[in-house]
Amino acid sequence: MKAKELREKSVEELNTELLNLLREQFNLRMQAASGQLQQSHLLKQVRRNIARVKTLLTEKAGA
């Protein structure tokens, strides 16, 4: 997910996206803990996407 795509979304859409990413991160962490996760790079991608969304929410709150 690109930051440019996220900047076009509204605050409500960003909050929804954040919830989806947090759920996905939880599921990936559970898979990793049980040894079922084959693509460990997804954890890093999701973590960075969460940071992108949170950063944009902070920017929009200040503006």
From Swiss-Prot:
Family: Belongs to the universal ribosomal protein uL29 family.
Disulfide bonds: none
Pfam families: Ribosomal_L29
Entry keywords, A to Z: Ribonucleoprotein, Ribosomal protein
UniProt entry tagged with the keyword Ribosomal protein: yes
Gene3D superfamilies: 6.10.140.1970
NCBIfam families: L29
GO molecular function terms listed in the Swiss-Prot or TrEMBL record: structural constituent of ribosome
Taxonomic source organism: Proteus mirabilis (strain HI4320)
Protein name, entry field: Large ribosomal subunit protein uL29
Signal sequence bounds: none
Any single biological process term in GO: translation
InterPro entries: Ribosomal_protein_uL29, Ribosomal_uL29, Ribosomal_uL29_CS, Ribosomal_uL29_sf
HAMAP family tied to this protein: Ribosomal_uL29
This protein's GO CC annotations: cytosolic large ribosomal subunit
Keyword Methyltransferase: no
